[in-house]
Regions:
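Gly/Ala-rich beta-loop-alpha elbow adjacent to hydrolase catalytic centers
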Residues: 6-11, 15
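Short beta-strand/loop motif that positions the catalytic acidic residue
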Residues: 117, 123-125, 129
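Conserved alpha/beta-hydrolase "acid-adjacent" motif
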Residues: 130-139
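Catalytic active-site module of serine/aspartate enzymes centered on a nucleophile-bearing elbow/loop
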Residues: 147-179
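Active-site nucleophile elbow and catalytic-triad environment of alpha/beta-hydrolase enzymes
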Residues: 92-114
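Short beta-strand immediately N-terminal to the catalytic nucleophile in serine-hydrolase-like folds
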Residues: 5-7, 30, 124
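Flexible "cap/lid" loop of the alpha/beta hydrolase fold
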Residues: 25-60, 100-107
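Conserved alpha/beta-hydrolase catalytic His-Asp/Glu region
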Residues: 64-100
Length: 179
């Protein structure tokens, strides 16, 4: 049988591209890049949280050694993330590929008209996502004409959060219900 696909953020964009050309049994897009690309969220971050915006720029230019863990927490985790885990994950952050950043800006919108309409699809949002807000995440579900759900209290990296089991259970339950 075709695979069940789960993609997060940029990986959700990869899943959308896959669906344009290949069958799948089901797909879940977790905190996906919005159809408008990164520009709206980047602008919102630059105006609303300039320190966070500056930290992203420093990290992109110089790597994880420039990351302030408090800012990293605001960026991708909820307030519930334990300090030790936050420090461990912050050290593992790497610069994004310039090509990938370009693709997420210029080619961010999936092309659902190319995909099979029979693939059950679900969009999962993180309620406290500083990168992609609920409206932007909902736009992905609207584009694909599929269901959408928000997990309150979760940061962008919901699969690493202390409450990751809630995200996993939500996905598993939906896959079973989708058949």
């Amino acid at each position: 049988p075709p695979p069940i696909l789960v993609g997060h953020s940029m990986g959700a964009l990869v899943v959308q591209r896959y669906l344009e050309q290949h069958p799948a049994s089901a797909a879940v897009l977790m905190a996906p890049v919005p159809p408008q690309g990164l520009w709206p969220s980047t602008l919102r971050m630059a105006v609303g949280d300039p320190l966070l915006y500056a930290q992203y720029g420093l990290m992109q230019a110089f790597g994880s050694g420039m990351i302030d863990t408090d800012v990293a927490q605001r960026a991708i985790f909820s307030e519930q993330m334990p300090d030790q885990a936050l420090t461990t994950y912050a050290r593992r952050v790497q610069r994004e590929s310039q090509r990938a950043l370009w693709d997420m800006n210029v080619h961010a919108a999936g092309r659902p008209w190319l995909a099979s309409k029979s693939v059950p699809l679900r969009v999962l949002a993180a309620g406290d996502d500083a990168l992609f807000n609920l409206e932007e995440t909902r736009a992905v579900a609207s584009l694909w004409g599929c269901g959408w759900q928000s997990l309150p209290g979760m940061g962008h990296a919901m699969m690493l959060e202390p409450g990751w089991q809630q995200a996993a259970d939500t996905i598993i339950r939906w896959i079973w219900e989708a058949g």
